[in-house]
Design a protein with these regions (language model features):
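Transmembrane helical elements of multi-pass membrane transporters/channels
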Residues: 22-41, 143, 154, 177, ...
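Short runs within selected transmembrane alpha-helices of multi-pass transporters and secretion channels
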Residues: 75, 144-162, 170-178, 199-212, ...
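Helix-terminus/linker motif at the lipid-water interface of multi-pass membrane proteins
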Residues: 36-55, 124-131, 187-194, 254-287, ...
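Transmembrane alpha-helix boundary and packing residues in multipass membrane permease domains
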Residues: 27, 31, 43, 80, ...
Length: 451
């Protein structure tokens, strides 16, 4: 493995518990820093451009989040394929995986950018954006979607580095990207007067520069990333595997936005206080989601490498260790959020009313105790995906979607806002009911070939 031996973190050896924790901590820090940036970005737009501009940016956030989730899942699937080849110590397979990922990412960028930009006006009409903010909403969304290539490039490089065992470099450049983004936000909006389009360009340029720098560091640390012409030969089987892994993961991550959109629609119908309380509570809820996503990234790369190496017992040990770590973090999140739920609301609202507290309290006190179900879902679903079983996670995703929509739309007329509060726990439980038995059945059988 001359191509990777210098910087690769081999997750097929050593203590599973400490290997996972060492890998996960940088990812958790990166996710938390990204959340901080998102909040700072909203403050800059709102304070400098006003409420209408903030509303314009916020009104398109679900569409942009939908696209970004698909990109992250799609390229994350490529990372699983590379991690499996890395675990198998298959240098030729690793090169072909990198080549296939690069080729598919280029094609995907071109197609997605064209579709998104051509449909931008129609998307805004579908969303019924108010006329007084539709112009700014279009400017912001069009620029962000025009820069889809930067997002794909950035996520592809980050997921490749993590697949090779390096979770620190993506952290460093995520921090760099976030700081640069905030600086460019201020520069483009205040002295250059570029409006919300300036905020969009700040996002795209910071991601692109971070991707380029990540690639430079990656090429230095991992010679396996230096592609040759022959690496692109006979890629049909490799491309097929990457598509089978990447598309379901992209779909699973983005389809969750549909369920969230249904929940938001019900909340919107309940009035301003409900929207304010739910929004503030959702910001706190994001902390747990980000931590669970980080643990998903860690166990994904761990299982992929050990699946490629054919080490079933080590996979079993790693899943147990990941469950302990994930549920430990979730317990801390639950206790912290429940104890600090009112100060958290005051972070986002200067003078919250009793009614707003009622809605935020209702959401957090119902959802937070069920974070442990989310932890089970995160670990088991990702472990199954990393062992080349995409059907069960896809089915679980559809169960989540159906249960989330059924709970909010079907029960809102009966129990009102409570339907929104119970939607996510019900969806998590339904998905786990399918995935946990699937995982244990898989572990009773010989591991399938990772070739």
């Amino acid at each position: 493995m001359s191509g990777t031996k210098s910087k690769e973190m081999d997750l097929t050896i050593g203590s599973p518990f400490w290997s996972l924790l060492k890998f996960a901590i940088p990812v958790i820090l990166g996710n938390l820093f990204q959340l901080f940036y998102t909040l700072a970005d909203s403050v800059i737009v709102g304070k400098t451009l006003g409420a209408n501009s903030l509303a314009a940016v916020g009104s398109t956030s679900i569409i942009i989040y939908f696209v970004f989730c698909f990109i992250n899942g799609f390229t994350g699937g490529f990372g699983i394929c590379l991690g499996q080849r890395c675990g198998a110590k298959d240098e030729k397979g690793m090169r072909k995986s990198v080549a296939a990922s690069t080729l598919l990412s280029i094609i995907f960028t071109i197609v997605l950018t064209l579709i998104c930009c051509l449909l931008a006006h129609q998307i805004l009409r579908w969303m019924q954006i108010p006329s007084d903010i539709s112009g700014e909403a279009y400017d912001y969304m069009f620029v962000v979607l025009l820069g889809t290539g930067a997002t794909v490039f950035y996520n592809m490089i980050s997921n490749m580095l993590r697949a090779l065992g390096d979770s620190k470099t993506p952290l460093y450049f995520l921090v760099f990207s976030s700081v640069l983004n905030i600086f460019l936000d201020v520069l483009f909006i205040v002295p250059l007067h570029m409006g919300v389009a300036g905020a969009a360009w700040a996002t795209i340029l910071s991601q692109f520069l971070s991707a380029v720098l990540s690639l430079i560091v990656g090429l230095k640390n991992f010679p396996i990333l230096h592609l040759r012409r022959e690496d692109f030969h006979d890629l049909n089987d490799t491309i097929s595997l990457h598509l089978k892994t990447g598309f379901p993961m992209g779909f699973q991550m983005s389809v969750m936005c549909i369920g969230q959109l249904a929940m938001q629609t019900v909340v919107n119908s309940l009035g301003t206080a409900a929207v304010a309380g739910y929004t503030a509570a959702s910001k706190a809820d994001q902390l747990s989601v980000l931590v669970n996503n980080a643990m998903m990234t860690a166990i994904s790369n761990y299982v992929a490498q050990n699946f490629g190496a054919g080490k079933k017992d080590r996979i079993r040990q790693g899943v147990r260790a990941s469950l302990i770590q994930t549920e430990g973090f979730n317990l801390l999140m639950c206790i912290g959020i429940l104890l600090l739920r009112h100060p958290i609301v005051r972070m986002f609202l200067s003078d919250p009313t009793v009614e707003i507290y009622h809605y935020s309290d209702a959401y957090l006190t119902i959802v937070a105790p069920f974070y442990f179900i989310l932890g089970l879902l995160a670990v088991y679903r990702t472990s199954i995906q990393s062992m080349q079983n995409g059907r069960a996670p896809f089915a679980a995703c559809m169960i989540e979607l159906v249960m989330r929509i059924a709970a909010t739309v079907g029960l809102s007329g009966i129990i009102g806002y409570t339907s929104v509060c119970i939607a996510s726990p019900l969806a998590w439980f339904g998905a786990c009911a399918l995935l946990i038995p699937v995982y244990y059945r898989m572990m009773k059988r010989p591991l399938a070939s990772a070739s």
